[in-house]
Amino acid sequence: MTDETNKNGPEAAAPEEFETAAEPQAAEKPEADASTTAPDPLELARAESAELRDKYLRLAAEMDNLRRRTERDVKDAKSYSVAGFARDMLAVSDNLRRALDAIPADAREAGDAGLKALIEGVEMTERSMLAALERHGVKQLDPTGQKFDPNFHQAMFEVPNTEVPNNTVVQVVQAGYTIGERVLRPAMVGVAKGGPKAATSESETPAA
């Protein structure tokens, strides 16, 4: 029995030794898998840097747009803050002009000193008021002889006239005004009808 045991002992122990030796390799395999799946710190830093740069560029663009909007709003506030007051003053200017137009031509030519002084005073007041409005960006439109533009003019009637191009402003019923780049009040006008079409400039001629 002893000999058989000694004889079979080494052979029986061999598989156990192989199994024991294989265990460290099996334990090392998960470590190898973990090392291959771990994120690269350099790549993480690059991705974070790109994300921060994108956020910075977006913020810079938003701040630039905000600055431009603020500058435009401040400019508009300065330019158009007097629009309501100027519109009210135009009614006063219109009344001064109506008063002057109501004076008959023969009365003007009569040479009455009192009437002449009154006319000069009203005209001076009108000029002074228009000059004050112009200092605040309000300008009077004089569209007589110009082509009718619905952005600046309001057609009140048509005048048969074959001597000027069609849709030419031939009479101003009420003066128009602009403030800055905006129309404060369109000019009320009469336009010609029946004349030739307005000549087209070379720049407006469509290309063949």
From Swiss-Prot:
Keyword Isomerase: no
Entries under Pfam families matching the protein: GrpE (PF01025)
Region Disordered, annotated ranges: 1-42
Presence of keyword Transit peptide: no
PROSITE patterns reported for this sequence: GRPE
Annotated Gene3D superfamilies: 3.90.20.20, Head domain of nucleotide exchange factor GrpE
Major subcellular site: cytoplasm
Compartment list: Cytoplasm
Key words of the record: Chaperone, Cytoplasm, Stress response
CC terms in the record's Gene Ontology section: cytoplasm
GO BP: protein folding
Function according to Swiss-Prot or TrEMBL: Participates actively in the response to hyperosmotic and heat shock by preventing the aggregation of stress-denatured proteins, in association with DnaK and GrpE. It is the nucleotide exchange factor for DnaK and may function as a thermosensor. Unfolded proteins bind initially to DnaJ; upon interaction with the DnaJ-bound protein, DnaK hydrolyzes its bound ATP, resulting in the formation of a stable complex. GrpE releases ADP from DnaK; ATP binding to DnaK triggers the release of the substrate protein, thus completing the reaction cycle.
NCBIfam families according to UniProt: PRK14140.1, PRK14141.1, PRK14150.1
Entry-linked PANTHER family: GRPE PROTEIN, GRPE PROTEIN HOMOLOG, MITOCHONDRIAL
Subunit structure: Homodimer.
Protein name in the entry: Protein GrpE
Encoding gene per record: grpE
